[in-house]
């Protein structure tokens, strides 16, 4: 049907007869001549139809509506100099039409304009419902092509290092990995369910036990959790696992992979090793294990200075084992008003939404500190000197303080830090600040349920375990850091991994630490324990979020812009109206009865 696509055309085609297929992007009538912007998947070309070319042809062209599918044949001409479009690769060319065929008319008015000229004015709900029209606009297609290139580069890199791509099951066993599972009823086993995998974690470990040595997979994963801009109920991981490997070797190898992707896709070179930071340093200085290091405003601990000045909120925070921390906003006295950091203000609300009771503040004015009387009246000259030294605050700076539970203080000041950085344009968006975060704790304490929870997952290997007897082993595990590492970019986690537990006894003890009984371990993970007893090699790996990598590379705000047919933030597919009801006969086959609470 066609012998060229738009992007292939250049000055060497002038005078040649070509056949093109595509959509009518726009039609314009000027001085008795019809101009049509023909669009295909590769780009645009202006085509012209003159009454002198034939009355029937001209009449047919007059009926064309935007998005009509056409095939045209004609001669490539050079455009007049005053009509050259320097924004198009074909902007110096046009096609003088000799023949036009309508391949498909549009039936109704479109729900939104497909032309790139109206791209920004369309609500996302409509774009998701009519995703095929959104794809046709080109921007989304370019995103998908960029995603394809990322995958291609990763595959070639891993293939060259002797990795084998293996598909692992999508119908598997429900195991406690953190988020809720998506369950699939098993018709042939009444009352039993498969689960869609949250990750290929256990299968890739079993591949190492099987001697595969180096594995990777572009893996579909599923988590039934609340959504946000960078999450979807189904998502894609670049999943990697290796045998007989150290943590240092995994970090170094995967850093090379990421550098290769950025080089091939964006033509950006990183000559130096990515910096590293321990989990504890990240939490102390940024309040998060995913720090954005493109700007300052580091968290500073003022507990030793303010904990005993007699201000009740500060005293209570320290006595209960909490924090008093601060961030310093350079020049904040002029850029942030009191209204914004008091109850009802936008910055106050950011802290409140993160769980904080509020924000205290200190304004530095010359050698004096301006704050509420209950704080100021209890500050000695020594206190003031210590505050200025720790916070590194100068005249004109604003110090914001949080006090209370450690997690809430860190979380709220982290959110406030991010919010202010965006509001004051402190972020250099041209920077790619990669960071390895290492030495995570094995567990975090769930005080509500009086038990430990794995910070990553319960298959991470603890560091420096020496004990063999159960009681001492239990104590060592509980206080150990993990052989775990995350790669963070500009405040977002790109991927995370660890060395895995390859000894059955240690794996059983870790699972007991997170609250499972021996019986529960055998029921849920018996197959893994058994495999580890049969000569499992030391192994480890990492999983990168492919959707998130693509989002950052293309500069999008949501991973929905990297996925052909994503769900919305209510986990619904607006295109197919899924999830949806199923028939009574289908439910009967599965022996499932649905009851809905009134």
UniProtKB/Swiss-Prot annotation:
PANTHER family assigned: ASPARTATE--TRNA LIGASE, MITOCHONDRIAL, ASPARTYL/LYSYL-TRNA SYNTHETASE
Binding site for L-aspartate: 177, 223, 456, 500
EC id: 6.1.1.23
Location within or outside the cell: Cytoplasm
Region (Aspartate): 201-204
GO cellular component entries: cytoplasm
GO BP annotations, alphabetical order: aspartyl-tRNA aminoacylation
Principal place of residence: cytoplasm
Name of the protein this chain belongs to: Aspartate--tRNA(Asp/Asn) ligase
Subunit structure: Homodimer.
UniProt cross-references to SUPFAM superfamilies, sorted A to Z: Class II aaRS and biotin synthetases (SSF55681), GAD domain-like (SSF55261), Nucleic acid-binding proteins (SSF50249)
Nucleotide-binding in keyword set: yes
Domain of life of the source: Bacteria
Family that this chain belongs to: Belongs to the class-II aminoacyl-tRNA synthetase family. Type 1 subfamily.
Entries under PROSITE patterns matching the protein: AA_TRNA_LIGASE_II
HAMAP family linked: Asp_tRNA_synth_type1 (MF_00044)
Task of the protein: Aspartyl-tRNA synthetase with relaxed tRNA specificity since it is able to aspartylate not only its cognate tRNA(Asp) but also tRNA(Asn). Reaction proceeds in two steps: L-aspartate is first activated by ATP to form Asp-AMP and then transferred to the acceptor end of tRNA(Asp/Asn).
Keywords from the UniProt entry: Aminoacyl-tRNA synthetase, ATP-binding, Cytoplasm, Ligase, Nucleotide-binding, Protein biosynthesis
Catalytic activities: tRNA(Asx) + L-aspartate + ATP = L-aspartyl-tRNA(Asx) + AMP + diphosphate
GO MF: aspartate-tRNA ligase activity; aspartate-tRNA(Asn) ligase activity; ATP binding; nucleic acid binding
UniProt entry tagged with the keyword Iron: no
Site (Important for tRNA non-discrimination) location in chain: 30
Residues that, per the record, bind ATP: 223-225, 232, 493, 545-548
